[in-house]
Amino acid sequence: GSEMCIRDRSWEVCNKVGGIYTVLSTRAKTLQEAFKDKVFFIGPDFWAGKENPLFSENENLCAAWREHALKKDGLKVRVGRWNIPGEPIVILVDFYPFFSKRNEIYGRMWEDFKVDSLHAYGDYDEASMFSYAAGKVVESFYRFNLTENDKVIYQAHEWMTGMGALYLQKAVPEIATIFTTHATSIGRSIAGNNKPLYDYLFAYNGDQMARELNMEAKHSIEKQTAHHVDCFTTVSEITNNECKELLDKPADVVLMNGFEDDFVPQGRTFAAKRKKARAAMLNLANKLLGLTMSDDTLIVGTSGRYEFKNKGINVYLESLNRLTRDKNLKKEVLAFINVPGWVGDPREDLVERLKSKENFTTPLECPFITHWLHNMSHDQVLDMMKYLGMSNSAESKVKVIFVPCYLDGKDGILNLEYYDLVLGNDLSVYPSYYEPWGYTPLESVAFHVPTITTDLAGFGLWVNSLKGRYSELKDGVKVIHRSDYNYSEVADVIKDTISEFSGLPENTIKTVRKNAADIACLLYTS
């Protein structure tokens, strides 16, 4: 029989930026088990001459083809394995040589597919040259190693990968192409620009909005790829609505994001890691705030990309501010915002204190941030905290700490990886306004941490569909109704939910935690 070969291509292969890294890295093990080494991931080679901690090069892998690709096709690639569960084969491609040919490439894309790259700026050139290079790599590999009898699928993720998929549609039509959009660039932009996305979705014209928002190139590649590939998919019904209205093409299939549970520790290891994470967060609070917070403190957190409105960071802060005046709150609250900003260095004064075993009784200056930012006076989180008068005073029942860096275990302050920290939370809050799927609340419940999300997140809608009603706190996921205009109500419901959680007896919390984990189990791909 013929061989099945899958090519999975994304900007976030061996390159951690956001949720798509999670999508790819957590399904690699399942794909490896099903197809062994017939699955190849293709990513950008940003690390020339430097060590990429996510990539282990192996010069024996595909050695003959690599030499052929370089000599005959002028393609410089490195082959190795991705350091994640499943350890799939990865091809990293050096796409910089294509920059000199970009006008010619864009010209062909216009002639063949009406992709309009005329107004390109920012990351468009870089993403498109990588995408095109990846398409050339697949063509080269296919012609060297395979025949027409071999079934090959090429899956491209997001607009950044569209050009490669279109190149293959024309150059090697026998390769089946799938394009998966995890959001629409125009939908995300409308939402982030304070325009009402949902009530008026039917009235927006994608092409017109692209002009208005100066996003014509990204929108064009996304739309034309959706229309021209063999199969177009997206991650949730809520995003499929955007595809219909803004790309003028519904998805052929809605493929919800699956999930691996390998990185969720079990049994005693889980308990030990949770204890360590809580101790680290409470110790950080002491060193930064000069206060001793009890083991009984309710730790809540949010995390994700720094999209202040879209991710609901604004409404999270609003709710925490209202919580300070809530008479029903039964515990002290320590709230974290783990969102990478324009981060500079870890604070030296805080690093010094963290070296000490002493219990501190005086706060540091700015006792609400762990690393200095390059834009301390123009940061949305800090601006809103200042506007609301949130200063972490000793009298306040709610303390907020902003950790504005990637939690990779080497941040200089907490020095814990994200997954080793998230399980220390008691409750997580993801009140998104724009969230096509919602990995962060899903990761939270996988770590037995109940979560608050909204019905504008694909994940929130999915949980509601499981329950046949709005999911409540007792179910492990509280889904709040959110619309274009009910910001204040959402803030109140978050406040009330945290307050309600603070009064739950221990045995009820155990049940809620179990219910949360059970929801995640339904999405495990293994």
Regions found by a protein language model. Give the residues of each.
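Catalytic cores of nucleotide-sugar-dependent glycosyltransferases that transfer UDP/GDP/TDP-activated
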Residues: 2-526
